[in-house]
Amino acid sequence: MLGYLLARAGVEVTVLEKHADFFRDFRGDTVHPSTLEVMYELGLLDDFLKLPHQQLSTVTGVFGGYAFRAADFRHLPTHCKFVALMPQWDFLDFLSGKAKEFPGFDVRMQHEAVDLIRVYGRIAGVRAKTPTGTADISADLVIGCDGRHAITRQVANLDVIERGVPIDVLWFRISRTTNDPEQLLGNINYGRALVLINRDQYFQAGLLIRKGSFEEMRAQGLESFRKIIREIAPYLGDRVEELKDWDQIKLLSVQINRLRQWYRPGLLCIGDAAHAMSPAGGVGINLAIQDAVATANLLADPLLTGDVSESTLALVQQRREFPTVVTQQLQVFAHRQLAKVFQNPGPMKAPWQLKAVFGIPGVQRLTARAIGMGVRPEHIKGARPSSERKAACIKSIAVGVGVAAAVVAVSLFGRRRRACATS
């Protein structure tokens, strides 16, 4: 996204991608209304929605057999009043294809960033490993978009603030039938929580487990794992037998952390490279998109004039740190409360507080705004009249209320110049 936006502004951009393609399973597959609004502002929405996807207009959960609607996106002040469920590789292929229409955009596949190039104390490029050897790519600015294990932030010795997370997630696929609920997302029972994301022909499923307990679970055997899934979601029935090997089940070690400082002279980190998020709410990819929009808005002109100082890079962190901190604080709190579910291995009943919270009129709209729009959603520079932006800012005050409501509910149960981005 950032490569597209900078190339669109006239900046020469080289994107380095480690792999030969974008195909990776169990990556973030949710495209939230805030991101879809960015696509609209860029004039890409119609083409984007032609890609295969599912639309999630409401979010429903089941707690111990009690079904409740947790969020309703149908009233959001956006052009798309839903979350689009789409494989991330399709999203990346789409953006890459559109970005290639700009003469200044260059994506180099199978280029893995392994080191940073320094000139007189300033980062001036990237050393990449390629199928034919190493390659040095010079740049006026290196932007690390290479995720939570980013080589850019490691080599630059950027200090990381870690937040303890008591859960991990086991991702797997299980087939889906036409009789399965379309809008159901979360299932809580028997001391476990199971997320089911509708991918049309199958569910992308995630079982939340105590952090570090995966090996213990493996030792108990695959049949025990299948039994757990059956207990939480009985309607899956014999489909759990599709899980025949532990290789079908992928462990995500959940992290929540952020950089104390996102930049060095010649380097900026954004997205997961600057702040690793948990999968809760599927907000990670969308927070990264918001980072990209803010970065392009703030740095396109300085890149064109060649005036990208540390103070200019600091503007990006100043703009995006507040949404990051708020979102992470809420995720940490939510996970700590959700971890309490593990303390009750038997059949569970929905607490009255859960029923009371989601019985309050309008709560589902507020949680939808919190999840779908987030804190301080970004807009393409010049895309909206200032009056609309002001109105949107006023409306966004409700986000805090919505997030708080969601957390309460949970507690109850990154002249032409050159830039280089790594991903």
What are these regions (language model features)?
Residues 5-27:
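Glycine-rich FAD pyrophosphate-binding loop
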Residues 252-269, 325-326, 343:
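FAD-binding beta-loop-beta segment adjacent to the flavin cofactor pocket
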Residues 193, 254-259, 274-286, 322, ...:
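Glycine-rich phosphate/pyrophosphate-binding beta-alpha loops
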Residues 100-114:
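A conserved beta-strand/loop element that lines the FAD pocket in flavoprotein oxidoreductases
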Residues 15-16, 144, 270:
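Generic enzyme active-site microenvironment
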Residues 297-423:
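C-terminal helical "tail/cap" subdomain of flavin- and related membrane-associated enzymes
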Residues 114, 121-136, 141-254, 258-263:
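Conserved FAD-binding catalytic core of PHBH/FMO-like flavoproteins
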Residues 32-100, 117-120:
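Active-site-adjacent segment of FAD-dependent monooxygenases/related oxidoreductases
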